[in-house]
């Protein structure tokens, strides 16, 4: 296992370097910059600001300096918010996104897995068709559309739920549903198809022939193997939920990482874009690694490929 983990960490380092290089190149290749097209600012002031942050230097020089800062844990200063660093945004935004993400993750797991199990056990019946119809709708509708519909119905029309912030338990309801809608639908469909496949295996028929109840067959024999495909996709799902949904956080004015990222994109705040991208990529890779390890532990038939 140690060799497997070390190999994956080496691969992650290479992938992270490529992500940093590509993102940095794209940010600095886009016409204009964080200080261009600013109304009422003389050209001399713009040039002075670019010189202050080293944006007047050749791109390779800027990249090497940026890598040096990253090695010291410094994501740089924000170009748009005086006195603020990207580390400040991550330090303040990550806990907010993580808190919202944990609530959403609990909602997703407690909803999607039972939905998938029930649909599989009622295969072909009205319960199955109803649940899969809901799941199909949830997969096809984007999160920002769901968020807008929820705000219109429950905030504007019924006036029963707040539309911004995370001040009370009620304020979690709309963003959690908007963020988790796709994941619930996708995992429910995956859980259903996986359980149906497992229920058709020979060892399940053998368990039934021994006189085990359907509940025992499902919980003791089928469910563990049926969860393996679900666990496989949990890595990116958990990473996406815990780091926040960019659009949903912006719509509900939740000051998480996604909220800062959207603002940085619209304002061309290069360092914030880079910092949030690197943070998200690193967290995603770490979650995928943890899921791979857990994947091998839950199914002894799978061996670590060192």
Task: Give the predicted meaning of each segment.
Residues 2-3, 94-127, 143, 166-306:
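Alpha-helical transmembrane segments of integral membrane proteins
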Residues 23-29, 66-68, 133-162, 180-182:
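Membrane-water interface segments at the C-terminal ends of transmembrane alpha-helices
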Residues 16-64, 158-174:
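Hydrophobic alpha-helical transmembrane segments of membrane transport/permease proteins
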Residues 16, 20, 24-29, 144, ...:
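Membrane-embedded alpha-helical segments of multi-pass transporters/permeases
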Residues 6-16:
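N-terminal signal-anchor/signal peptide hydrophobic helix marking the start
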Residues 12, 93, 97, 133-140, ...:
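Residue-level signal for discrete positions within transmembrane alpha-helices
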Residues 51-59, 75-83, 164, 187, ...:
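Membrane-interfacial helix-loop-helix junctions in multi-pass membrane proteins
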Residues 56-113:
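An internal, D/E-rich "acidic patch" concept
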């Amino acid at each position: 296992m140690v060799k497997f983990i070390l190999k994956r960490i080496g691969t992650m380092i290479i992938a992270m370097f490529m992500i940093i290089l590509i993102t940095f190149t794209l940010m600095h290749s886009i016409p204009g910059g964080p200080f261009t097209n600013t109304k009422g600012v003389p050209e001399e002031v713009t040039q002075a600001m670019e010189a202050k942050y080293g944006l007047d230097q050749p791109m390779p020089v800027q990249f090497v300096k940026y890598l040096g800062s990253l090695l010291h844990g410094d994501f740089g200063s924000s170009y748009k918010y005086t006195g603020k660093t990207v580390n400040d945004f991550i330090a303040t935004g990550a806990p907010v996104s993580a808190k919202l993400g944990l609530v959403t993750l609990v909602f997703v797991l407690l909803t999607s897995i039972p939905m998938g199990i029930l649909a599989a056990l009622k295969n072909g019946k009205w319960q199955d068709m109803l649940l899969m119809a809901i799941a199909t709708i949830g997969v096809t509708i984007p999160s920002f559309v769901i968020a807008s519909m929820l705000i219109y119905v429950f905030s504007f029309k019924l006036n029963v739920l707040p539309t911004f912030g995370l001040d009370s338990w009620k304020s979690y309801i709309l963003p959690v549903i908007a963020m988790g809608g796709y994941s619930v639908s996708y995992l429910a469909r995956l859980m259903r198809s996986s359980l149906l496949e497992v229920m058709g295996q020979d060892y399940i028929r053998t368990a039934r022939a021994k006189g085990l109840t359907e509940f025992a067959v499902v919980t003791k024999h089928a469910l563990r193997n049926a969860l393996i495909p679900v666990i496989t996709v949990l890595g990116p799902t958990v990473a996406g939920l815990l780091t926040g949904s960019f659009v949903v956080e912006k719509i509900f004015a939740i000051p998480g990482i996604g909220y800062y990222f959207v603002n940085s994109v619209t304002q061309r705040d290069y360092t914030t874009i880079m910092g949030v991208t690197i943070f998200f990529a690193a967290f995603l890779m770490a979650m995928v690694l943890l899921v791979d390890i857990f994947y091998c532990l839950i199914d002894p038939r799978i061996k670590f490929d060192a």
